[in-house]
Amino acid sequence: MRVLQLAYGDLMKCSDIPIAYTPAGGYGPTFPPLILGNCTEPLVEGAPDLRGIWKVITATRAGETVAPDDRLMSYTERIEQCGNRIVDCGGGTIADARADGTEENGVHDVSVFDYTTPIHVVASYEDGIFVLRPVGLPGIE
């Protein structure tokens, strides 16, 4: 029934799509299938359109240019957006959140460094900027 409704113009909202999480050990060398690919809900007011594939072109660390053979220089991520939801796949992890400023709807997944350490991050759109605030780090509000 849902497919027929969509064929006749009904919106597929971001809330209709289950939250995605990083699989054990990360998703591997290729991106997983699109998570929000069937979502037709427009982006919320004030959300910057960040959808697409993003690749590091240049980077600095501690004020120094990162060497071309540093693994950071091969980092690529894919961002999907729908409604107030944003999904960032990169480094083997999936960060899926509603950018509504609440801890409840933030990212609850694992760190890219070991695929086991829990991370909790509040996501929001503020003045046209995508803002991430890790939970439990003093001085980050």
Question: Which residues does each PLM region occupy?
Answer:
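Amphipathic/hydrophobic helical signal segments and adjacent flexible N-terminal regions
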Residues: 1-75, 81
